[in-house]
Amino acid sequence: NLLHNETIYPHPPQNEFSKSAGKVSKLVSTYRIDAIAIGNGTASRETERFIANLRYDREVKVFVVSENGASIYSASKTAREEFPEYDVTVRGAISIGRRLSDPLAELVKIDPKSIGVGQYQHDVDQVKLKRSLDQTVESCVNLVGVNLNTASKHLLMYVSGLGESQAQNIVNYRTENGPFRARAALRKVPRLGEKAFEQCAGFLRIPDAENPLDNSAVHPESYPVVERMAKDLECSVKELISNKALVGTIDINRYKTQTTGTETLTDILQELEKPGRDPRTKVQVLEFDPSIRTIADVKEG
């Protein structure tokens, strides 16, 4: 949810530098802000320098974030549903900030074609293009995994086995009953059948779950296998998870069955070593050369 919004005018023609600086510094102090996202559109370089040169009472990192598709989101039905009381400029700013916090969760709200990747996207079969783009987004979402207690309907829709109505039912159930404590509670969601549960459960994460496996990519069907591994090693599942030395002693051949083969067991061991691992790397702060301000400053290297 949006806690606060302000509009500042540090650049010409208003040149309200001091007033803008005071507003930003106060917001950083009040809300204990650690990072600031700046859209890469008009006056982004000037704004980045303005924000970076201010003095704060804490360390603040400044990031320049792509605005591609933000204007389309801000005028969309999704944005109106999320923030009906704000205009398109505020919605666009919210989207840019959220992209820094969790880019995947925010970008799924935008038609991939709106991001404008590739200059020939309008020359190809639009049906095939949409299918391919949707498959790519779905693949990314399922590879990363989704926090069951914070994900929006738009993010849940891309989880394998879930559609728009099921995603909305999950959000409604969460709103009415509070956060999920276990993956098994998904079975209580209206109109979410056993087949849908089977397909989606392994991609949904619950960080504070009582069973640590609920925050991993291990599917509930494989929980008994992990429990047996832990029992054989005379430790708990919690002690086994993230213990590379213990996991390294496991002989997968002992746990093969007709339904659990070598590939599945290998995936389980990899997940036990690094549960809930995120394939995305840590964000890096990219600094622009301060000497380059106009096209005339660009020289041959």
Annotate each predicted stretch with a short phrase:
Residues N1-D134:
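Phosphate- and other anionic-substrate recognition elements at nucleic-acid/protein interfaces
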Residues E6-T7, N40-T42, S66, T150, ...:
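Active-site proximal loops enriched in glycine and acidic residues that flank catalytic Cys/His/Asp
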Residues S25, S29, A52-R55, T175, ...:
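Signal for well-folded cores of large energy- and translation-related assemblies
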Residues I72, E81-P179, E194-A230, D267-D289:
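Long, highly charged, low-complexity intrinsically disordered interaction regions
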Residues R181-A182, T294:
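Alpha-helix N-cap recognition
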Residues L186:
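Conserved nucleotidyltransferase catalytic core and NTase-mimicking acidic/glycine-rich helix/loop elements
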Residues K231-G301:
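Structured C-terminal cores of nucleic-acid metabolism proteins
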